[in-house]
């Protein structure tokens, strides 16, 4: 089992759970995923659709990890953007933000550059 396969499997479990919870049980997602740091809005369901899409693409990544590497790159970019532009300013200002999500994102941003196969296609 490759590192990419492990990451795709983790995506299926974690992003799948967040996606399903956010789409069908948004109030629970508000309490658990974003740790009561935001008021309920339909944005929770929008984010749920996004995360469920990551999970579904990751299912394909279990079978074709090289072809689905762009999913991992996308995760690296959006998580790496969210941390300095959302989590860090909130932390510095003493404002609430989902710390569990921030820690998970931080781990992923550190791990993903070592998991992504940076070789050009065909190598």
Task: Give the residues covered by each predicted segment.
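Interfacial loop at the N-terminal end of multi-pass membrane proteins
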Residues: 21-47
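Core segments of alpha-helical transmembrane spans in multipass integral membrane proteins
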Residues: 40-63, 76-84
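Cytosolic juxtamembrane helix and N-cap/initiation of the first transmembrane helix
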Residues: 1-14
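Membrane-water interface at the C-terminal end of transmembrane alpha helices
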Residues: 105-123
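Membrane-helix boundary connector in multi-pass membrane proteins
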Residues: 84-101
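Juxtamembrane loop-transmembrane helix junctions in multi-pass integral membrane proteins
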Residues: 2, 34-42, 63-66, 70
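Alpha-helical transmembrane segments of multi-pass membrane proteins
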Residues: 13-27, 112-116
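Juxtamembrane "helix-exit" motif on the non-cytosolic side of transmembrane helices
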Residues: 24-31, 87-92, 116-122
């Amino acid at each position: 089992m490759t590192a990419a396969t492990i990451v795709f499997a983790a995506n299926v479990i974690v992003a799948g759970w967040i996606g399903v919870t956010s789409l069908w049980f948004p109030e629970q997602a508000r309490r658990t995923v974003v740790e009561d740091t935001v008021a309920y809005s339909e944005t929770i369901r929008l984010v749920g659709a996004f995360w469920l899409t990551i999970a579904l693409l990751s299912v394909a990544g279990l079978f074709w990890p090289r072809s689905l590497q762009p999913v991992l790159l996308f995760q690296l970019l959006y998580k790496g953007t969210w941390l300095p532009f959302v989590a860090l300013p909130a932390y510095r200002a003493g404002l609430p933000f989902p710390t569990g999500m921030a820690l998970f994102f931080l781990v992923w941003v550190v791990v993903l550059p070592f998991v992504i196969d940076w070789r050009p296609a065909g190598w």
